[in-house]
């Protein structure tokens, strides 16, 4: 019976199914028949596509947050709505495709797109818009039509959806998912999609297909990730080039789910909302899901989770158009509270508490609106606020990796945080949110992933200065880190450049880019493929020619392990000719540093050759601006056939000689590299060249475009239009390089004004990698390059220009009419904004401008081309002596100072200083050994001075300060080349300033009032050179003393351009040339002037200020053996105090021509006079007491310290100072503020010009307090292309000549410590992706450990969070030695003074003078200190900086300088603070230590005050201003604690409080400097 019922039931069921199928078939036939009849009746009739136009008029309110109406209109007519912002004002009112009829009662048919945009902008609060909406009577067909099928044939889809969509992971039983080659992809919106993939389907193909389906525009934020089944917090990224087949075939693949996620979180979600509302909504849904799944549970606080839940609930209410006052009971019953609150929170909190908290937060969220805003908060605002709250979590906006940092001699276990906000940062203190930036994405050139073992991999992050971050991680984490860095690089720097190449598939055929073939197909099931796709698609399979310098280097062999690229290169006729041999190698050789594949390592640094190679390629390829070729099959053979010839001549090739030069300059490096590279033929590039890595931009095999860094060929925007397809590529014949550089004028469209700086490759053979471990006091393994090496290397530099390109003219085609490089489509990767930025920071809106010096010379006198301002100040010492080895790295490598002694220095006087060199003092004040450094160094502040007096008594032994060749036509006195004018050795001169922008040299003119006269080399009366025409200026001394004071170590410690690590006056100046060369009979008041520049100086009589003399460390002998500088401290005799003058120190920039030198000198030109003298006295020595020759080096160091608010410690060790001893003799002050924007002839030998950058448009008045000086305190301003500011001196004040109340405004541009714009290259980097301000709120106790023995603390601090970055990108910025040095130097006119400029020096002078005059008793000292501190706080509250600007392209240089100075200054401040908390000292000693701390604080503030701004760094400087105020406030508390300790004695409580305040100050200083942490801090 039961069987009968069962059988009957099955029969009925089958019958019902048959009936249903029959009914469906019958309906299908009927509909098809009706369709045929309709088609026969009229072809236009189609019942399935009936369009019903409906007219709608809607009123849209402007979104107060986004300031827009939430929709976008088409640029073409008729005006239609193309997009509606999700959650915006127009959401639900307008729809894509609506045709606009009226906007604010204006008919749209008469409107252009521009006018429509204007109407939208002019509409204040609301917009009335009438649209026509075409609605279809029936749903769109999802079946493929013939039309769609035809489109798909021309535009094939690479990824196919499976036949069903899974909801929440549940399948309806379709067996398709059990078939092979199907990937289930889980979306964050709850959907699951199934993809059928092929053997060559990649991750990128899947992503692009999902992009179509979801209509996402900003796909660069997305990636595929594998989520572990049992640990949802572990997500592993997939590289876009990975094959899906390989991913699915992994053994552990069954334990993972594949997710489509926003893996690269934007810095500001508002940017994403404006850019792509769909992607923003996806990110919001993903974030909500992550919160509910507790991905951020480690960081998330309960209050934050509840607030997010309230926002989520409100967003749902608004999005679902629910009534505003909906009860939580309804939400809990209808929606479920578990959909908004994480399970852990539900378990741990009572339901009543949860409801109460959510109600509170929902009310609070209403306050997001402005008080007078009437409209309700929108869903978009709630979503935005939700994401902004989440953005405060480090694990949301970044990802933490535990890695082992591989240093040279040790390993360091660190926690890395990688994210858009943080770059690559090291987490120092997670609780206090203290991080140190190791690298920014914009500074990364390449990422490599190497498998060390089955479970461990190595990630190498190559930075622009050829520094490598080597990180050891677990294999999955290593891959995630590499993919994350590459993804953020694409997102933030260059969307078309992949810096992480997937090693698996190098021979892939051309792949469609993210935009190619998919851009317009936004509708579901690919049913709306655009016609543009059909047009573009045939080109996608067509190989596009790469634009690149195609030169045959060495015909290399394919190394094992690298898949060859000749097949790729030869696939078609468009390939660049030698791509299979040359181009790929060139791209790889130049790619920063591939030392592992190259097979050799330098002895002390793995990256020294890499620095040279990559810069050589940068320089060569960028210099040959028109060297592009259209590749053809014949070209490959022709170039290959020439390769043997090339091999023989490769040593002299212009393309390679830079590397040769650098290798010769470092013989040890050369020996190691060539011995380790067995495959090298003639040159050390073969292994590198044979390393073929397939750059994603180089799928077509034309790898040479890796380095088509055409010099200013075209804006990068010309390269970035991915929709423009140009199948042909145009090139130009290479310019010939003549003996003296480029002899042909380049087309203006092809070249910017030539960059006058030496090639970057001329760098120290020892890389910065040697300096990883400053705290460990490593010494560089090899001796620095000596002058002999440089001289041998120089012919190669000459041969570089002699050797023309080997490419024959027939292989090149003319360039485009405007010199523009044709853009490339997405498949052939284009360059876009960044043209492979490296250490030279070549990211500009234009392509790089790296060119060779215009005046190369094979003589030793021009060897200074090889000097590199930052790392190589000693490379070109002019004598075959050992050099001062490691004073060059300006970021502070203290241990490096102990390496080499100076060989040929003049006999050194035993120094009484027991302090280490300033670099040692900066970095490790009490832990460094100092003897070898001090004994072998030159004086920290050494003056070169020569007297110019009528009797020529003191000129015989004087060494002029810098070089100015007598043969140079623009020298002041061309004929003066007497025995006393020793030539300045090129070794002391550093590379050329970038500021030399071709301004024609002029004769310097001095103008005053109505009278003016010019200073030329042929001036019959050179005595007038330093005199004004005003007859009242009569205080000129007859024995004018011009002192050029070099402070190289000060410059170094300040992080400046290491002006002259070896001073100009050091050693016997065998090669010096006269800079300010007097005639054979020098005139009394002549200032040596370079006529190419402008000089204006007025001697002034000074009040007695107790000029201080100080001891010299050594003597300097000239080439004849005479004692030029007696370095003894002498007491002055015979001069009344009234004859004593104060000094004004002034920074002069000595620039040399075309790739020569720039040296910054500090010019101390003291001026006094005892008698009234006619304005232009010919020669009248009467009344002037000249110094004896032994006094010639009477230095002004103590005055410099006093006037610049620096104690001798801030310089290179303490100098003994006689505070009350005035200098003997009267010095005529000739402070020459000179400008020289142009250079002497291009072919001239070395010469120097003064080149300060900031300048005064007009003179300024100098109020006087001494009646004798009323008419003598004016100086003249010489007007020129670069307005130079002149300096005059005042009476009375040691630093200022006016009181603030008399002149509240001081010219902002009158800073003698000028900004050089000292550049070795043009550079512009992407805006620094910095970290947020330190989130320490109040207590800094846990930031650092308390006081410990100082040696341990110094070492620990330097290792854990070094105050000074261990390396830096090339810097140029403002080489200002000290803040506001010329506070008492003013120009003289009636222009109002700007308080902003001189308020700081005035304060410094007064505060420090008052402190020095304060009695030693504790109460008075602290009271005075408190007053000064309060004044400092007032200054910081009311003003900030001088307001000077620097060009954006030099922002990186200035940032490097700011960072270096801040790190050095903060280190000194913290070091002095540690002296205060010592237990074993008397109150008087403590107060002395406190005074030192205040002095260092003033110095630190001064460093911050002198920042210059641009659009890129102004925000960072504003933040630094706030942090500086925090430092001063914390310091105030520190001083109060110190005062309390002094008054109450050293009780435990007071000492603990003092130590705690010291710790707080340390953290505050750290917060100040953390924003300036170098992107290459390791």
Curated annotation (Swiss-Prot):
According to the entry, every stretch annotated as the PDZ domain falls at 57-135
Q: Which segments show compositional bias classed as Basic and acidic residues?
A: 1100-1117
Q: Could you tell me the superkingdom of the organism this chain comes from? A: Eukaryota
UniProt biased composition (Polar residues): 720-729, 793-811, 968-986, 1139-1150
Example GO biological process: light adaption
Q: Which CDD domains match?
A: FERM_B-lobe (cd14473), FERM_C_FRMPD1_FRMPD3_FRMPD4 (cd13183), FERM_F1_FRMPD1 (cd17168), LGNbd_FRMPD1 (cd21942), PDZ_FRMPD1_3_4-like (cd06769)
How changing residue 572 to D affects the protein? In a breast cancer sample; somatic mutation
PROSITE patterns, alphabetized? FERM_3 (PS50057), PDZ (PS50106)
Q: Where is the composition biased (Basic residues)?
A: 822-831
Q: Where is this region: Disordered?
A: 555-616, 720-743, 759-831, 950-1030, 1070-1194, 1347-1374
**Any idea where this protein resides?**
Cytoplasm, Cytosol; Cell membrane
Gene3D superfamilies, per database record: 1.20.80.10, 2.30.42.10, Phosphatidylinositol 3-kinase Catalytic Subunit, Chain A, domain 1, Pleckstrin-homology domain (PH domain)/Phosphotyrosine-binding domain (PTB)
Q: GO terms for CC?
A: cytoskeleton; cytosol; plasma membrane; protein-containing complex
FERM domain residues are: 181-496
Kindly state which keywords UniProt assigns to this record, in alphabetical order.
Cell membrane, Cytoplasm, Membrane
Membrane topology term reads: Peripheral membrane protein
Q: Which Pfam families match?
A: FERM_C_FAK1 (PF21477), FERM_M (PF00373), PDZ (PF00595)
Under InterPro entries, the record lists: Band_41_domain, FAK1-like_FERM_C, FERM/acyl-CoA-bd_prot_sf, FERM_2, FERM_central, FERM_domain, FRMPD1/3/4_FERM_C, PDZ
Q: How does it assemble?
A: Interacts with GPSM1. Interacts with GPSM2 (via TPR repeat region).
Function, please? Answer: Stabilizes membrane-bound GPSM1, and thereby promotes its interaction with GNAI1.
* Name of this protein: FERM and PDZ domain-containing protein 1
Mind giving the lineage of the organism this protein is from? Eukaryota, Metazoa, Chordata, Craniata, Vertebrata
């Amino acid at each position: 019976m039961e069987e009968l019922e069962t059988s009957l039931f099955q029969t009925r069921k089958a019958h019902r199914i048959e009936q249903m199928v029959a009914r469906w078939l019958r309906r299908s036939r009927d509909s098809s028949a009706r369709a045929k009849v309709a088609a026969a009746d009229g072809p236009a009739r189609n019942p399935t596509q009936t369009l019903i136009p409906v007219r709608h008029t809607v009123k849209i309110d402007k979104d107060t947050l986004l300031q827009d109406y939430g929709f976008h209109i088409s640029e073409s007519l008729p005006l239609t709505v193309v997009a509606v912002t999700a959650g915006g004002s127009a959401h639900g009112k307008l729809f894509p495709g609506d045709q606009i009829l009226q906007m604010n009662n204006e008919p749209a048919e008469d409107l252009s797109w521009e006018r429509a945009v204007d109407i939208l902008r002019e509409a204040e609060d609301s917009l009335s818009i009438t649209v026509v909406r075409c609605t279809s009577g029936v749903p769109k067909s999802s079946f493929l039509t013939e039309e769609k099928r035809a489109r798909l044939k021309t535009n094939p889809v690479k990824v196919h959806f499976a036949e069903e969509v899974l909801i929440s992971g549940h399948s309806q039983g379709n067996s398709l998912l059990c078939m092979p080659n199907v990937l289930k992809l889980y979306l964050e919106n709850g959907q699951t999609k199934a993809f059928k993939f092929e053997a060559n389907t990649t991750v990128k193909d899947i992503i692009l297909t999902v992009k179509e389906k979801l209509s996402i525009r900003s796909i660069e934020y997305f990636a595929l990730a594998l989520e572990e089944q049992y640990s949802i917090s572990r997500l592993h990224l997939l590289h876009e080039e990975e094959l899906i087949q390989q991913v699915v075939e992994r053994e552990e693949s069954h334990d993972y789910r594949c997710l489509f996620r926003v893996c690269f979180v934007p810095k500001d979600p508002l940017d994403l909302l404006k850019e792509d509302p769909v992607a923003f909504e996806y990110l919001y849904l993903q974030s909500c899901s992550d919160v509910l799944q507790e991905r951020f549970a480690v960081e998330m606080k309960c209050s934050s989770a509840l607030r997010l839940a309230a926002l989520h609930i409100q967003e749902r209410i608004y999005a679902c158009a629910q009534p505003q006052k909906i009860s939580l009971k309804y939400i809990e019953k209808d929606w479920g509270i578990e959909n908004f609150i994480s399970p852990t929170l539900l378990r741990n909190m009572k339901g009543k508490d949860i409801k109460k908290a959510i109600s509170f937060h929902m009310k609070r969220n209403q306050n997001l609106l402005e008080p007078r805003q009437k409209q309700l908060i929108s869903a978009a605002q709630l979503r935005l606020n939700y994401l902004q709250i989440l953005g405060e979590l480090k694990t949301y906006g970044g990802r933490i990796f535990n890695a082992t940092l591989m240093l040279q001699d040790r390993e360091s276990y660190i926690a890395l945080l990688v994210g858009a906000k943080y770059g690559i940062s090291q987490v120092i203190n997670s609780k206090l949110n203290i991080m140190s930036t190791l690298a920014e994405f914009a500074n990364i050139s390449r990422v490599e992933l190497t498998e060390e073992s089955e479970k461990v991999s190595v990630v190498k992050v190559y930075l622009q200065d050829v520094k490598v971050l080597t990180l050891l991680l677990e294999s999955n984490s290593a891959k995630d880190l590499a993919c994350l860095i590459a993804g953020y690089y694409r997102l933030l720097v260059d969307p078309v450049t992949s810096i992480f190449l997937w090693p698996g598939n190098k021979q892939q055929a051309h792949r469609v880019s993210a935009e190619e073939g998919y851009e317009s197909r936004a509708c579901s099931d690919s049913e709306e493929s655009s016609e543009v796709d059909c047009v573009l698609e045939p080109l996608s399979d067509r190989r596009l020619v790469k634009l690149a310098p195609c030169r045959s280097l060495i015909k290399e062999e394919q190394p094992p392990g690298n898949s060859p690229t000749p097949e790729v290169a030869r696939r078609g006729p468009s390939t660049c000719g030698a791509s299979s041999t040359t181009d790929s190698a060139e791209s790889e050789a130049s790619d920063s540093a591939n030392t592992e594949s190259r097979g050799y390592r330098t002895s002390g640094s793995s990256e020294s050759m890499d620095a040279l190679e990559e810069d050589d390629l940068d320089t060569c390829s960028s210099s040959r601006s028109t060297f592009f070729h259209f590749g053809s099959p014949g070209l490959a053979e022709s170039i290959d056939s020439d390769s043997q010839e090339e091999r023989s001549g490769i040593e002299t090739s212009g393309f390679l000689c830079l590397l040769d030069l650098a290798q010769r300059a470092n013989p040890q490096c050369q020996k190691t590299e060539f011995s380790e590279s067995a495959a090298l033929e003639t040159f050390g590039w073969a292994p590198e060249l044979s390393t073929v890595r397939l750059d994603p931009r180089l799928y077509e095999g034309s790898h040479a475009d890796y380095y088509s860094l055409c010099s200013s060929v075209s804006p990068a925007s010309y390269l970035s239009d991915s929709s423009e397809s140009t199948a042909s590529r145009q090139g130009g014949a290479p310019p010939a390089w003549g003996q003296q550089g480029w002899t042909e004028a380049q087309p203006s469209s092809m070249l910017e004004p030539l960059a006058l700086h030496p090639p970057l490759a001329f760098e120290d053979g020892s890389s910065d990698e040697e300096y990883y471990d400053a705290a460990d006091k490593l010494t560089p393994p090899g001796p620095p390059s000596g002058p002999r090496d440089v001289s041998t290397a120089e012919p190669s530099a000459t041969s570089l220009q002699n050797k023309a390109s080997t490419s024959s003219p027939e292989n090149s085609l003319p360039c485009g009419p405007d010199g523009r490089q044709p853009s490339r489509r997405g498949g052939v990767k284009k360059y876009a904004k960044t043209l492979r930025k490296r250490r030279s920071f070549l990211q500009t809106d234009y392509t790089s401008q790296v060119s060779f010096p215009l005046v190369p010379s094979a003589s030793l006198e021009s060897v200074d081309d090889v000097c590199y301002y930052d790392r190589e100040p000693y490379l070109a010492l002019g004598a075959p002596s050992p050099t001062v080895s490691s004073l060059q790295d300006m970021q502070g490598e203290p241990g490096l100072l102990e390496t080499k002694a100076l060989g040929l220095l003049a006999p050194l006087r035993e120094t009484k200083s027991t302090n280490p060199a300033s670099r040692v003092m900066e970095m490790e004040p009490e832990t460094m050994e100092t003897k070898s450094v001090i004994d072998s160094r030159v004086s920290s502040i050494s003056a070169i001075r020569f007297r110019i007096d009528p009797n020529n008594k003191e000129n015989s032994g004087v060494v002029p300060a810098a070089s100015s060749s007598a043969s140079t036509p623009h020298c002041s006195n061309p004929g003066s080349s007497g025995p006393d004018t020793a030539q300045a050795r090129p070794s002391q001169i550093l590379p050329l300033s970038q500021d030399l922008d071709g301004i024609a040299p002029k004769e310097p003119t001095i103008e005053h009032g109505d009278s003016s006269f010019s200073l030329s080399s042929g001036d019959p009366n050179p005595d007038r050179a330093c005199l004004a025409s005003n007859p009242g200026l009569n205080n000129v001394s007859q024995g004018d003393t011009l002192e050029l004071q070099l402070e190289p170590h000060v410059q170094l410690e300040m992080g400046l351009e290491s002006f002259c690590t070896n001073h100009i006056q050091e050693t016997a100046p065998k090669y010096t040339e006269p800079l300010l060369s007097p005639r054979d009979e020098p005139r009394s008041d002549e200032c040596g002037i370079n006529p190419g520049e402008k000089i204006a100086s007025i001697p002034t009589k000074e009040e007695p200020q107790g000029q201080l003399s100080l001891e010299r460390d050594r003597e300097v002998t000239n080439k004849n053996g005479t004692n030029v500088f007696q370095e003894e401290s002498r007491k002055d005799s015979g001069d009344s105090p009234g004859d004593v003058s104060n000094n004004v120190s002034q920074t002069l920039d000595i620039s040399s021509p075309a790739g020569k030198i720039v040296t910054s000198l500090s010019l101390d030109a003291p001026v006094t006079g005892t008698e009234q003298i006619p304005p232009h006295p010919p020669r009248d020595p009467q009344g002037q007491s000249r110094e004896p020759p032994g006094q010639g080096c009477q230095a002004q160091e103590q005055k410099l310290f006093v006037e610049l608010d620096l104690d001798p410690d801030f310089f290179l060790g303490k100098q003994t100072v006689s505070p009350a001893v005035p200098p003997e003799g009267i010095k005529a002050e000739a402070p020459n503020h000179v400008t020289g924007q142009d250079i002497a002839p291009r072919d001239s030998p070395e010469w120097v010009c003064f080149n300060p950058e900031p300048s005064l448009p007009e003179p300024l008045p100098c109020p006087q307090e001494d009646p004798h000086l009323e008419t003598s305190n004016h100086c003249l301003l010489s007007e020129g292309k670069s307005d130079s500011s002149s300096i005059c001196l005042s009476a009375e004040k040691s630093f200022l000549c006016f009181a603030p109340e008399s002149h509240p405004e001081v010219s902002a541009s009158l800073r003698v410590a000028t900004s050089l714009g000292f550049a070795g290259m043009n550079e512009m980097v992407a805006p620094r992706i910095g970290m947020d301000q330190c989130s320490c709120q109040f207590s800094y106790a846990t930031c650092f450990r308390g006081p410990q023995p100082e040696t341990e603390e110094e070492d620990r601090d330097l290792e854990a969070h070094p105050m000074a970055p261990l390396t830096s990108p090339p810097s140029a910025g403002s080489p200002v030695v000290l803040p506001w040095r010329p506070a008492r130097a003013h120009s003289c006119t009636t222009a109002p003074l700007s308080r902003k400029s001189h308020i700081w020096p005035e304060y410094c002078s007064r505060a420090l003078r008052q402190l020095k005059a304060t009695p030693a008793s504790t109460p008075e000292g602290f009271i005075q200190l408190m007053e000064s501190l309060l004044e400092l706080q007032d200054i910081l509250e009311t003003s900030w900086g001088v307001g000077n600007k620097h060009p954006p392209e030099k922002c990186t240089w200035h940032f490097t300088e700011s960072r270096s100075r801040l790190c050095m200054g903060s280190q000194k401040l913290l070091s002095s603070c540690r002296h205060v908390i010592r237990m074993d000292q008397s109150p008087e000693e403590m107060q002395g230590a406190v005074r030192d701390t205040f002095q260092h604080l003033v110095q630190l503030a001064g460093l911050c005050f002198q920042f210059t701004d641009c659009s890129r760094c102004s925000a960072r400087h504003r933040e630094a201003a706030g942090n500086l105020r925090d430092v001063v406030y914390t310091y105030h508390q520190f001083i109060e604690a110190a005062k309390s300790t002094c008054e109450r004695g050293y009780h435990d409580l007071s000492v603990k409080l003092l130590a705690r305040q010291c710790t707080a100050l340390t953290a505050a200083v750290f917060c100040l400097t953390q924003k300036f942490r170098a992107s290459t801090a390791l």
